[in-house]
Amino acid sequence: MDQAEYFHSWCRQDEMMLNLLEKCPTQQIQRLPLPIRRLEKKQEIQKMLEARREDYHKAMEGVAREWEKLQEKEAEIRVGLEKYKKSIVKNDKKQERAFRDAAKARSMCIQYDLQLKALQEQCEELDKKRAKTKAQVQKYEKCHRYLEKVVKASEKFQSIPELMSQFHALVSYLPQEEQEEQKSQESRSQRIHCMEEKSDSIVQFSNEIHRLYIRLEKAKKKRREWELRWNQMLKTATRKNLLLGTIKAAVRDIFQTVISQGLGSNSVGEDDIVEQLEIIRKDIEDLTDIWEKLSLNEELMEPIRAPLLPTDKTLGHPPSQ
């Protein structure tokens, strides 16, 4: 038999004993043994515990209700706190707006004060101008009466404004007349100045023409001189060309004579005068050396016939063709 079964059996015995005690009177209960009395006390304690448990449950239910109420109040407080925060933010914004409005109002007051001072100064200036105009009106009142008399006396004008408009038209026309007169004087002075400049330029051009004419005469004179020089140069060149042709013909004759005697080479061209003269010079030097040698040995050797050289008479004639 385990403990659970023992406990259940003991509980059943206790219940049976309690039922018997309820059926027995109180005098008999006092005579009951100690275990029964203990069981009775235990039952009383259980009843007290159950009563306290019920009180505890009731108290917990009340606490739960109070807790719900507290949560509702907390939610209400939170909502109120949010509203309070929003109201604080709104109040801050309103305060800032009020500060800005106050600053604007102060600046507007300052501007209005400045405008008021400016208007006061303008009023003072207008008062001064009014006093001046009043003095001028009093001053020119005689003129007004005089103009009225003039209008009455004249048949052309019907009122003072008409007379004044005519007067202003004439006054405005006078500067135009002065300007036109000034323009005409300026144009006249410009024309005179232009004529003077033209006359000066004409004199300068005439002087320049005279100077150029003198230069032209000098150039013509120089041209004639250079023409004379050119003619002289042509004559001199012609004469020198003739002399050069004569010299060339003489050189050619001498060269032909030297070639005919076999003293030079025939490979030189007919127009190469320089080579021909060089060959003639060499031949003359050779003949001179030979002649000197022969003159030294004249007594020992037979007379040698020297080659015939061209005479002065044949120098100026060209060779026979």
Curated annotation (Swiss-Prot):
Pfam families assigned to the protein according to its UniProt record, in alphabetical order: DUF4200 (PF13863)
Keywords assigned: Coiled coil
Taxonomic superkingdom: Eukaryota
GO cellular component, as recorded: cytoskeleton
Coiled-coil region list: 36-144, 202-229
Similarity remark: Belongs to the CFAP73 family.
Protein name listed in UniProt: Coiled-coil domain-containing protein 42-like 1
Natural source organism: Xenopus laevis (African clawed frog)
Lineage, highest ranks first: Eukaryota, Metazoa, Chordata, Craniata, Vertebrata
